[in-house]
Amino acid sequence: MSSRSDEEILAAVSPAVVTHYHKIIAICVKHIRSSRLSRSILQKKADDLHDKVRARHFVDVVHRVAELYSRKLEESDRIDFDSMIGDAVQMVETGRYTSPFSLILVDEFQDISVPRAALIRALKHQQPFNKVFAVGDDWQSIYRFTGSDITIFTDFEANFGPSWQGRLQRTYRCNQLLADTAASFVQRNPKQLTKSVISSRPAIPQSIRVVPVRVEKYKETEAYRGAAMRILKRLDHHLGTQADEWKTAGRGKLTVLILWRYNMLDPFGGRPPTFDHIKVSGLSFHRSKGLEADYTILLDVSEGDYGVPSRIEDDELLNLVIPLPEEFAYAEERRLFYVALTRASRGVFLLVNEIRQSRYIHELCEVGPTAVRFETADGRKIDRCPKCHEGNMVSGRDADETPYRACSRFPACEHKVRQAIRSPAISPAFRAASTTFDSRRAGR
């Protein structure tokens, strides 16, 4: 039997599989070059993965691709960003470049990667009295997929030597109750640095509104779009009733951010609706970092593969080149939700699938009971199930028309309260007339 040609093999493979490996190879080549990873180092890492045979074959391919790409750049006298970092480290370490600066300032330090940390260390060690001044927030470290390694931040002294650690604890974005609740939530991971947050804005009770949404299969986007539109109309109407007072205070439109975990959930296809009194924009959780708005609406804060936290796992081949996942379950997903949660100054609406709310909803209720309110998209209060504390109490009728209140998570939760049918109120005059009538009947 003759072997298949490359073209025949490629034709037999699903396009989705080809696309997947294109992405994996591109990411790995980037990190191989920036971190100067040798084939032997990669093969050693491959032996630590679950599928060692697959990983070793992949190393042979991807390292060859990285070599060919590097050669192509050299032949065309070009340089890419990864070359800049790697070459800079080599030039500093070999003394080809001597920095005239004794103070190295680094912003957004929570996003630091191994190659960039190597460059900072090389610059620091050029002179005995060089200092590193780094500013960052480990609670907002959300870029592991680009090579960010949070341990470089949390283990600063192990990487850069003895240090002084200051605290920037004041926030000018969230109100105090929202800030406290979000801080308690993210610090449930014991590996996060402990901090207190002091807000310049006073606490606003029930700053977090949980809105259960009935979602039909394959119609998630439509369901969340409908609920989001009702909330937006509420906000626009509310501000409209205070338009004169708002304008007198010299304020512009109220700002609202609609946020989602994955871009496929964008309910407006990149074209958010316009209103008279509010300005609406939408983007992903990751892209919202650094932004703020008066209100935010977070979509599909529910359990599921593409939910919050996301259960989509990276291909283990990426562990050849990026930091290993943290031991604490969904550590980066927790930080990502924290980032999305803290974009609002006044309040945040969490739109959840009514039958599979995110585990984070229950946690928020535990750490901030006065911050959370359950309501419909129209603003009506919803009572939570007193048994499971996850579902909501909904009304219905049994086959015999007896009304009841039960948990929305049935049959997972069987809590149910049958409600007695009240008899109509009987007036004293009617009761007296009935007594007289009965007496006459008895006299017959």
Where are each of the predicted segments found?
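C-terminal accessory regions
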Residues: 302, 306-378
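Short cysteine-rich clusters marking metal-coordination/redox-active sites
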Residues: 385-388, 407
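Short metal-binding segments enriched for Cys and/or His
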Residues: 409-436
